[in-house]
Amino acid sequence: MKVAVLGAGAWGTALAGHLAARHDTLLWARDAALIAGLQARHENSRYLDGIALPDALRYDADLGAALAHGAADDALCVIAAPVAGLRTLCHAMRDAGCVPAHVVWVCKGFEADTHLLPHQVIAAELPEQQSNGVLSGPSFAREVGQSLPVALTVASVSAECRERTLAAFHHGAMRIYTGDDVVGVEVGGAVKNVLAIATGISDGLGLGLNARAALITRGLAEMSRLGVVLGGRAETFTGLTGLGDLILTATGDLSRNRTVGLQLAAGRTLNDILGALGHVAEGVRCAQAVLALARAQSIDMPITQAVCGVLFDGIAPRDAVSGLLRRDARAE
């Protein structure tokens, strides 16, 4: 199978390395200097340093060439750009005049200005693209790059897209499950990043494991409430792309969103934290979108509201926690 991966950040690079072990894989980035470094060293020293990439993996800064590779009869196109750049990439794909027949995206979050999920952005910008889906689940790029075991879910209403994605990714240490709840999978992948900031704050303040468990459990309830109202199925949120991804992102030290929370608890400013990270922390980007959607639907999401207060309203982390503890008692 031919596979084109669009986006050479940490996640796109790790997935391309996995795919290249079995398939004819081309990794694209618009940054010619990044591509030149990949070609010279077979390592993404900018985003995934220390991980050797397969010799068979090829690289290109020409979007047209990458799209042509991913548009072959027996091919798959993987969109690994962050949500913030998804619409721009779709524009470029359309302008290139070559939209692959089978597309799967791996980005997580809501578009900041429109509050749209990735599938809604793609439907608006590439309406002719019908065989598509989302690949998501509890996963750190570095561990995938190290070929450590991982389980992901592809969700699509297209059986052909599910089967093609399964054929591409299900090998080696990667196990793929299939489903059709695109909305549920996307909401889980977005909201868990916001909740991971909350658990990072709690852990950074030294509030203990009991508090962490409470935040994860009540955070899952927030995720499910929003997801069901937006069209997802309740059972999706207890699976890999909901609870599974939440547990990993909230507790794993490779989590950028958890790191943001830890650093906020230590008294650092958000600008300093993001500057030091040098990578995307999607929870920061989509927290306001999640809260706006919740308010528009009259959904109670107190943990998300507390995170937004710390990130954007100058509320001290310890005061945000105190506010949660002062909430009225209620039935679970």
UniProtKB/Swiss-Prot annotation:
EC number: 1.1.1.94
Entries under InterPro entries matching the protein: 6-PGluconate_DH-like_C_sf, 6PGD_dom2, G3P_DH_NAD-dep, G3P_DH_NAD-dep_C, G3P_DH_NAD-dep_N, NAD(P)-bd_dom_sf
Cellular compartments per GO CC: cytosol
One Pfam short name: NAD_Gly3P_dh_N
Pathway membership: Membrane lipid metabolism; glycerophospholipid metabolism
Domain of life where this protein originates: Bacteria
Active site per UniProt: K192
Subcellular location: Cytoplasm
Enzyme class, first EC level, given as a word: oxidoreductase
Binding site for NADPH: W11, R30, K108, A141, R256, V280, E282
The name this protein goes by in its record: Glycerol-3-phosphate dehydrogenase [NAD(P)+]
Lineage summary: Bacteria, Pseudomonadati, Pseudomonadota, Betaproteobacteria, Burkholderiales
Gene: gpsA
